[in-house]
Swiss-Prot record:
Annotated transmembrane regions: 216-236, 264-284, 295-315, 341-361, 385-405, 410-430
Record's compositionally biased regions (Low complexity): 1-22
Membrane topology of the entry: Multi-pass membrane protein
Name this protein carries in UniProt: Sphingomyelin synthase-related protein 1
Alphabetized Pfam families for the sequence: PAP2_C, SAM_1
A GO BP entry: ceramide phosphoethanolamine biosynthetic process
UniProt source species: Mus musculus
Keywords: Endoplasmic reticulum, Lipid metabolism, Membrane, Sphingolipid metabolism, Transferase, Transmembrane, Transmembrane helix
GO CC annotation, single: endoplasmic reticulum membrane
Gene3D superfamilies assigned: Transcription Factor, Ets-1
E.C. number: 2.7.8.-
Length: 478
């Protein structure tokens, strides 16, 4: 279909907003400078040449309603006044047309910033938004005029502000996914996007750099912390209070629930299942390097805090079934050998590791809760079964710790609280880009600033096969 017939069909169907009002018939052959008339309004008649009378408002109205069209370049202040009245902005005709002499070209380049800032300083937010919507309709119709003047959608000075581009291309995320379609395909988040910082537009690109060297550094960090924790556990075992002198402290849960001998083993079984689920999610996730880095940094930080709480205060054993006595390791090498045994056995009774005195706070609760939160955060929200299973394993694991009388209730509560708060604080900072360049964030959270400086925004839940296809599979499926 020819371009003219297509444009005519669009005009007849009404798909364009008031086209006969926005492009008008040519009123005069040439442009001449405008001068104020005796009433203070602009004398648009000067454009007709010397001695030509200025058109009245009724004449301009008639011309605008006519079948012919006038290029917006030839719009005068009276045309803009008629357009403003037609759009319902009567109260702004005087300030825009008479006082500030807004013609067609200047109307086309009007921005929301112009309306908010001096000399206009319009105070009514609704009027600002409605006026800008009307102006953007004009800009959309007259994009050829804007491009001729050097304004285009790629230009940083374009009146078609980056805000519109951000609304059209931004991906609003929930749990790492678009909110409008959590079950649909994940859009490409590597494209440039816009954001507001301190009231101004800032152009930034979504970055999700894997930075494997930082991931390796975070793994080294967490392994060093685990080794240090094992050594502290050896020291606190030497300082465990005598059971005859310091009996178990009163505890509401432990006093009310009888001990289940096999419960602590079930806690570690729950932890192993959660660990396998997390390893599977980690392998299949597209941004596995970022996920592993975050897990190691968070786990290392929580266990480093646990080292201090264990060391500064030694609580009495929580039950008479625990045959814990202060065990003295003679030399430093013996302590290191015992610490290596705890470290290599992951501190689990399933691997034959038995410790005493490491009560404030529960390391098993930390691991269970951290794995649960990572599984639920980095899997799609629609995977309800997996999320329910993860929470069931977490809560049952905590219950089994208390049912086995291996920890006081306060140990479990503090561990759960610290782990969840640290996880949520970390991800809130990571998902809020304004904190990435914050001096306060760099001072208070130096490790966070180091690990997350090149992760710009929420990590989307995208999955891919981590291994290369075998040669025979490539030949079969391409």
């Amino acid at each position: 279909m020819p371009a003219g017939s297509r444009a005519g069909s669009r005009l007849r169907s009404g798909s364009l907003p008031r086209p006969s009002r926005l492009t008008l018939k040519a009123l005069r052959p040439a442009y001449a400078p405008r001068t104020p008339d005796s009433n203070g309004d602009l004398d648009t008649g000067s454009e007709l040449g010397p001695g030509s009378p200025a058109p009245t408002a009724e004449e301009v109205e008639k011309e605008m309603a006519g079948p012919s069209q006038l290029c917006i370049r030839r719009w005068t202040t009276k045309h803009v006044a008629v357009w403003l009245k037609d759009e319902g902005f009567f109260e702004y005709v005087d300030i825009l047309c008479n006082k500030h002499r807004l013609d067609g070209i200047t109307l086309l380049t009007l921005t929301e910033y112009d309306l908010r800032s001096p000399p206009l300083e319009i105070k009514v937010l609704g009027d600002i938004k409605r006026l800008m919507l009307s102006v953007r309709k004009l800009q959309k119709i007259h994009t050829d005029v804007l491009e001729e003047m050097g304004y285009n959608s790629d230009s940083p000075m374009s009146p078609m502000t980056p805000f519109l581009s951000a609304l059209q291309s931004a991906d609003w995320l929930c749990n790492g996914e678009p909110t409008h379609s959590c079950d649909g395909p994940i859009p490409d988040l590597s494209s440039d996007q816009y954001q507001y910082m301190n009231g101004k537009n800032k152009h930034s690109a979504r970055r999700l750099d894997p930075e494997y060297w930082k991931t390796i550094l975070s793994c080294v960090y967490v392994f060093i912390v685990f080794g240090f924790t094992s050594f502290i556990m050896v020291i606190v075992h030497e300082r465990v209070p005598d059971m005859q002198t310091y009996p178990p402290l009163p505890d509401i849960f432990l006093d009310s629930v009888p001990r289940i001998p096999w419960a602590f083993s079930m806690t570690e079984v729950c932890g192993v299942i959660l660990c396998y689920i997390w390893i599977l999610v980690l392998l299949l996730h597209k941004h596995r390097s970022i996920l592993l880095r975050r897990l190691c940094s968070l786990m290392g930080t929580v266990f480093l805090l646990r080292c201090f709480t264990m060391f500064v205060t030694s609580l009495s054993v929580p039950g008479q079934h625990l045959q814990c006595t202060g065990k003295i390791y003679g030399s430093v090498w013996e302590k290191l050998r015992r610490a290596f045994a705890i470290w290599s056995g992951f501190g689990m009774t399933l691997t034959g590791v038995h410790t005493c005195g490491d009560y404030m706070f529960s390391g098993h609760t930390v691991v269970l809760t951290m794995l649960n939160f990572f599984v639920t955060e980095y899997t799609p929200r629609s995977w309800n079964f997996l999320h329910t299973l993860s929470w069931v394993l977490n809560l049952f694991g905590i219950f089994f710790i208390l049912a086995a009388h291996e920890h006081y209730s306060i140990d479990v509560f503090i561990a759960f609280y610290i782990t969840t708060r640290l996880f949520l604080y970390y991800h809130t900072l990571a998902n809020t880009r304004a904190y990435h360049q914050s001096r306060r964030a760099r001072i208070w959270f130096p490790m966070f600033s180091f690990f997350e400086c090149n992760v710009n925004g929420t990590v989307p839940n995208e999955y891919c096969w981590p291994f290369s296809k075998p040669a025979i599979m490539k030949r079969l499926i391409g």
